[in-house]
Amino acid sequence: MFHVVPSNKQELLTQVLIAFIQDDYAANKRHVFDASSIVVESQGMKHYLNMEIAKQTGLAMNIDYPLVSREIYRICRLVLGDDVPHDSPYKREYLVWNIYGILQSDAFSEQPQATLANAYWQSQNDPNLQCFRLAKQVADIFEQYSIYRSDWLAQWEQGNTLGLSDALEPWQQLIWRMLTQDNKQHPAYLRAAAIEGLANATELLPNPLYIFAVNTLSPTQITFFSELAKHTDVYLFFLNPCSEYWGDLVSDKVALKRQLANSIEILQAEEQRHPLLANLGSQGRALFNQLQDIHYPDITDNQLFIAPELDGHNATSILHTIQADIASGMLNPTAINAIEPDRSLQIHSCYSPVREVQVLHDELLRILQHDPSIQPHEILVMCPSVEEYAPFVNSVFRPVHKPQAPGSPQLVCSIADRAPLDSESAVMMFLDMLELPDSRFSVLKIIDYLHIPMVQTKLTLTPDELSMCQLWLEQANIKWGVNAAHKNGILHSNDSDEIYSWEWGLQRLALGCLHSAAAGQPANYDYVIAIEGLNTRVLAKLLVLIELLKQFRNALTGAKSIAQWVVLLQEMLAELFASSNHEEVLKTIHKAVVDLGKQVEFAGFDGLLELAIIRESLTDRFSIPDALNQFLTGQVTFSSMVPMRSVPFKMICILGLNDGVFPRVSAPNSIDLIAVSPPQKGDRSRRNEDRYLFLEAILSAREYLYLSYQGQSVKDNQTLEPSLVLQEFIDYLNRKFTTPDCFAETVIQVQPLQPFSTSLFDTSSELY
């Protein structure tokens, strides 16, 4: 049976989940080492559940947290048997290489349907790289088709066309048919086959199956779980913001259209609807309605809904009044004199990202000083893109240049959701080295390499020796280019000389070791008298690095098989990096290289690959944020605004709520047929995901909600508009709280341009 367990509190859902698991173990006499499975939608939720289960039961072990698609595939394997491979060949990382092989094949390019696809990549300057990029785009959209348009794929497989686009559909259908000729076990096929075989595999099915805090499911996924529920118990723990029925709420835009034609009674009902649920809750409302459509009455069960006053909170705080309003689903205007002034809701208008972080830092210190119940690990700070704020967080929260005074307050923090490419200098250097065949060998770039700790360890180079090397390179007047031939190749000429090149400069340094100041100088070299005694060993270390880079520059040229690339890249890692104190970073790079080799081999691609394709593949891999690293580490957590991570915190802060920045705008894939066809129920929308994320943040804040945006231009002091979601929230506040003046003006604090402004030190100022 399918059970929906709704609540407006994540903590209550967690308690019920733990109780269900404990009851299941007791009723079925399961052993403590028996595995449990909880389907989640993000790695952050996995970490939160592990921590909560351990906190409430004393132990969290042997629990698997698959994502929705992975769990569906696992159940398909249980039902259909070992004929289904352990890893789906239709996973994106494998699908890319299969599609790349098809695009490169004569069997595809000679077909008339392939004309437009061929023209797209064959007319480019680097056709093989463009072909690979097209393969990545096609893999992305096929993955979406299998979830949201599986009926299209079934029609294509049967040879039918849908008339979606004369320019796009023919060659996409051809690629899909060529993919399924060799292996028909794509996700859509497996789901349909597994549903038919469920009745004969009841004993193999997970019993029960828990799905926790997933706020979006495609119609095909809901259909699969509802069919599965006919043979086993499926529990969906649904974070439902409202205890009442809210599936018929509409946004302000739709409501305005209705008001033009409806009666006064309907207009009054529209006025009472909750604007935040109506405008921000589109994604959650879509799942709510899909669950209603399949007739699961548990969705409206309000036993697990709890108002702030019943949760041990002060129901008269501004934040809890707002949350109670959302839970009721109605807009209930409140006189501001009924609420004591508090700091539970704060909105700050700043000049720049660095001022946002500085103001946040001061406010966190203030709250931690006045509210001892709040601990740093109970504070979450989110940004649309944490990478844009990471440098400012490091400078404000971790000022390495400023010694900490004894007794002064200090906030420890961690920055989550950072990609290795942005956070690890060794990763950036490794990818830089993959550009050696096209590199100018700039002296500044080589000095950057020397500053990488793993390279210094490999060369046994001390900080003093590094400074010495920089001085020598400056004195030797080395600028760029390996030698004259290399400079000619870069400049596409035949008249370059070797002056200012590496060979020219290093020979000047070497000759300086052999000659005294009084000795005669060779005709073509003005040698540098800078090195003597044991310092020659330091020069040798520099020469070793340059020689290795020259060798790998030559080795990286030309196309190679994936096995040859893996061997070469591992050799580069071994020769240039040392793992002493940086083992995790080195493991990350090594794993990415090995995984790339396995993916290409699993896909069955045996052609030669150019360096540009290898470099782009690894760049894509290193650009993926690490969702678990630095999240919930016992400190103030900074993270990106990640959908489906509705983890509760006592204090939630959101920075960067600027117009045009959030909700985030993502350009649709130009070859995506979903984008050019009529929308269907359950379709994903990045914009709606971000709007619902903002609503979840409001609901997940237990004591304090802190919002910040850049409201003044740092260039000309012009007023800048906040994000549309923040403006809608401000409009709601003005409707919710009745005051003689505009309520929002009393909540929004306009911060000065500089942190040393006198207003910040004036005890009579609100900013003090």
Question: Which residues does each PLM region occupy?
Answer:
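Polyanion-engaging groove/track-forming segments
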Residues: 1-768
